[in-house]
C-alpha cells in the first residue's frame, strides 16, 4: 500500500510540476457500484472488476491525501519567517522524534513529513539526516532536476549560519590536517588514520562502487603528492637498469583495464568480537568494494627493469609514500610468480572508474593485485623491488595472518603463519538490515558474494529460518573468465514470508567453483586479529502484522 501511495504522489507531482493543483476538487458520495471521480485532475484506470475498483478508490484517496497534505505544508512554509541555524543544530535533527533536517547549499530543510514518501525508500534519505544533501545527489544525478528542487523548496525552514560554510584553517602541525574530505555516508571506524565503510544499503546499490563511497583503509596520514614531480622507483635486476618513472612514463606502457573487488582482511571482524575480543577495527560487512581499474601491467614494468621469472622463490616488495613520524612507510609484497604472470593481471593503476585515483585510494599510483587481500594493494606507490624474501614491513610480517582459536597474545608466533594472500569465499546480506521490520507477504533479500584467487562464485544459498531450509538466490553482475573471477557477484532473492511468521532469521552462504563453502559459525574460525571472518552471515528481522 505504501508503494502505491508513493507512486500516486510522485505522478501527481510530476504531472503538475509541483504547482498548486486547483482546489476545486469535488468528492462525490459513492455507493458500492459508483466509481470515485474527482473533477480535477482526471484519473483513468483500466479494468471493471471489483478488485480494480477497490484499488482505484484507494489509489485516488491516497494520492488526493498526499496532494492536500503537500499543499497545506506549502502554505505553512510560506508563512514562516526565515531562521538562521548552525551546523550543530542541523546535525541534532536526525530522527522522527527530533525532526529530520538536511541542508542544500545555504538552505536548511525539515523533510520529516517526506521521508516515508521518498521513492528510494526512507533508509536512503535518512543517510543524509542532519547533514548536506550534495554528496548523495552527486551519487544519484536524478535528483538534480528542477521539479525535485521545487519539491524540496516547500520544506525549507531557514538558512545555514554563514560561518558554518567557511572552510576550516589547516593546522600544519597536525599530520592528518591535509587529509581529503570524505563522503558523509561512510561509516567511520577510525578518524586518524581514516578508515570507513559504506552503509550496506548503498554498498550493493551498484555493481561498480562509486569512488566516494568505496571503503577506505588507511594505516597512516594521506600524502598529498604532486603528479608533475611524482616518480616511481623500480629497482633493476642484476645486469638490468633501475627505472624512475613519471606518471607520463607509466601512461606510455600498454594500458589495461579490469574490474576487481578489493576486500580488507578484517571485513566482518565485528562478528568475531561477539564471540571473543579481538584486536582491530570493528569492520562490519562493508570493508569490500568493486571498481574498474586501469593502468600498466606490473609484469611489463618489471620486464623493462630486466626482471624475469626465476626458479628460486622471490617476492616483489612495494613501498608506499605514506609514512609515520619516524619515516616508516607502509609496505607489502606478493610472490614474483604472481607479479610476472600476465594472466594474473597485476596492475600499477592510475585510474579508478574512469578517473584519476582519488587521494584516499592511492593517487597518483597504486598496486592492484586481483584476487588478493586488500593489504597487498599498496597505495601511493613509491618503490618496487624484487627480493629473495617477502617484505620486512610490519604489515607483512607481523599483521594480516590467521591463527588457531587457541592462540592468544601471549603465545602467538607470527613467524609460524604465512601472510594472507588469497582470501576465502565470502558473502553477506546488505538488505534488509539486522533488526529491521519487513512487510508481510514477500521479502526481498540482497547481498554480495566473492572469493579470492579468481575463483568464481557459482551459488548463493539463502535461508529464512536460520539454516533449516534453503533457497537459491539469483546472481547478478559481469560474467567472468575461468580462474579470473576478480570481481564480486551481487545476488538477490524474493521469497514469500510464511503466513503468521513474526520474525525471520535470514542466513546466506556462498559456494565458489572449487566448491569451497563458508563455515556455519564464527567460533571455529575465531582468531586474535579478527581476520578471515567468513562464517554464514545472519540477519534477524521482524515481520509487520
From Swiss-Prot:
Presence of keyword DNA-binding: no
Q: Name one GO biological process term.
A: sulfur compound metabolic process
What the record notes about the co-factor is: Binds 1 heme b (iron(II)-protoporphyrin IX) group non-covalently per subunit.
Concerning InterPro entries, the annotation shows: Cyt_B5-like_heme/steroid-bd, Cyt_B5-like_heme/steroid_sf, Cyt_B5_heme-BS, Ig_E-set, MoCF_OxRdtse_dimer, Mopterin_OxRdtase_euk, OxRdtase_Mopterin-bd_dom, OxRdtase_Mopterin-bd_sf
Give the binding site residues for Mo-molybdopterin. 215-219, 264, 322, 361, 366, 377-379
Instruction: State the top-level EC class.
Output: oxidoreductase
Q: What is its EC number?
A: 1.8.3.1
Co-factor requirement: heme b; Mo-molybdopterin
Region annotation Moco domain: where it falls in the sequence: 175-401
The residues that hold heme b are 118, 143, 145, 147
- GO cellular component terms, semicolon-separated: mitochondrial intermembrane space; mitochondrial matrix; mitochondrion
Summarizing the function annotation, the protein's role is: Catalyzes the oxidation of sulfite to sulfate, the terminal reaction in the oxidative degradation of sulfur-containing amino acids.
Tell me what disease the record lists for it.
Answer: Sulfite oxidase deficiency, isolated: A life-threatening, autosomal recessive neurometabolic disorder characterized by severe neurological impairment. Classic ISOD manifests in the first few hours to days of life and is characterized by intractable seizures, feeding difficulties, rapidly progressive encephalopathy, microcephaly, and profound intellectual disability. Children usually die during the first few months of life.
Name of the protein described by the UniProt record: Sulfite oxidase, mitochondrial
Q: Which organism is it from?
A: Homo sapiens (Human)
Amino acid at each position: 500500500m505504501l508503494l502505491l501511495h508513493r507512486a500516486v504522489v510522485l505522478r501527481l507531482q510530476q504531472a503538475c510540476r509541483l504547482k498548486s493543483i486547483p482546489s476545486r476538487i469535488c468528492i462525490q458520495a459513492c455507493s458500492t457500484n459508483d466509481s470515485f471521480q474527482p473533477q480535477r485532475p482526471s484519473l483513468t484506470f483500466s479494468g471493471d472488476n471489483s478488485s480494480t475498483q477497490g484499488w482505484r478508490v484507494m489509489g485516488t484517496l491516497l494520492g488526493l491525501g498526499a496532494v492536500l497534505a503537500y499543499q497545506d505544508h506549502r502554505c505553512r512554509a510560506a508563512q514562516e519567517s526565515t531562521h538562521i541555524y548552525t551546523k550543530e543544530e542541523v546535525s541534532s535533527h536526525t530522527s522522527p522524534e527530533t525532526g529530520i533536517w538536511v541542508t542544500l547549499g545555504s538552505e536548511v530543510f525539515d523533510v520529516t513529513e517526506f521521508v516515508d514518501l521518498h521513492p528510494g525508500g526512507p533508509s536512503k534519505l535518512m543517510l543524509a539526516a542532519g547533514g548536506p544533501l550534495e554528496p548523495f545527489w552527486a551519487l544519484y544525478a536524478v535528483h538534480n532536476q528542477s521539479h525535485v528542487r521545487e519539491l524540496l523548496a516547500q520544506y525549507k525552514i531557514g538558512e545555514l549560519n554563514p560561518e558554518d560554510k567557511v572552510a576550516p584553517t589547516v593546522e600544519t602541525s597536525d599530520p592528518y590536517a591535509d587529509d581529503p574530505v570524505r563522503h558523509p555516508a561512510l561509516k567511520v571506524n577510525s578518524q586518524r588514520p581514516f578508515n570507513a565503510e559504506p552503509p550496506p544499503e548503498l554498498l550493493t546499490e551498484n555493481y561498480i562502487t562509486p569512488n566516494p563511497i568505496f571503503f577506505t583503509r588507511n594505516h597512516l596520514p594521506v600524502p598529498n603528492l604532486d603528479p608533475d614531480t611524482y616518480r616511481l622507483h623500480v629497482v633493476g635486476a642484476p645486469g638490468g637498469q633501475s627505472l624512475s618513472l613519471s606518471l607520463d612514463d607509466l601512461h606510455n606502457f600498454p594500458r589495461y583495464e579490469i574490474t576487481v573487488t578489493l576486500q580488507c582482511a578484517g571485513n566482518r571482524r565485528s562478528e568475531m568480537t561477539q564471540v571473543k575480543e579481538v584486536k582491530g577495527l570493528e569492520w562490519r560487512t562493508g570493508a569490500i568494494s568493486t571498481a574498474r581499474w586501469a593502468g600498466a601491467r606490473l609484469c611489463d614494468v618489471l620486464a623493462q627493469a630486466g626482471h624475469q621469472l626465476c626458479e628460486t622463490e622471490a617476492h616483489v616488495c612495494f613501498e608506499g609514500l605514506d609514512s609515520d613520524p619516524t619515516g616508516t612507510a607502509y609496505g607489502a609484497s606478493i610472490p614474483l610468480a604472481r607479479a610476472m604472470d600476465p594472466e594474473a593481471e597485476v596492475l600499477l593503476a592510475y585510474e579508478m572508474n574512469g578517473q584519476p585515483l582519488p587521494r584516499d585510494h592511492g593517487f597518483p599510483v597504486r598496486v592492484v593485485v586481483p584476487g588478493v587481500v586488500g593489504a597487498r594493494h599498496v597505495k601511493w606507490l613509491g618503490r618496487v623491488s624484487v627480493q629473495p624474501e617477502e617484505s620486512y614491513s610490519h604489515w607483512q610480517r607481523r599483521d594480516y595472518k590467521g591463527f588457531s582459536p587457541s592462540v592468544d597474545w601471549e603465545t602467538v608466533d607470527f613467524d609460524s603463519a604465512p601472510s594472507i594472500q588469497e582470501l576465502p569465499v565470502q558473502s553477506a546480506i546488505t538488505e534488509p538490515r539486522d533488526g529491521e521490520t519487513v512487510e508481510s507477504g514477500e521479502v526481498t533479500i540482497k547481498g554480495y558474494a566473492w572469493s579470492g584467487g579468481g575463483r568464481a562464485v557459482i551459488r548463493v544459498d539463502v535461508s529464512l529460518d536460520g539454516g533449516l531450509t534453503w533457497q537459491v538466490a539469483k546472481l547478478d553482475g559481469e560474467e567472468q573468465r575461468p580462474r579470473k573471477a576478480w570481481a564480486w557477484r551481487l545476488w538477490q532473492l524474493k521469497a514469500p514470508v510464511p503466513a503468521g511468521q513474526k520474525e525471520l532469521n535470514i542466513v546466506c552462504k556462498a559456494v565458489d567453483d572449487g566448491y569451497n563453502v563458508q563455515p556455519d559459525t564464527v567460533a571455529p574460525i575465531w582468531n586474535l586479529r579478527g581476520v578471515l571472518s567468513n562464517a554464514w552471515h545472519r540477519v534477524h528481522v521482524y515481520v509487520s502484522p
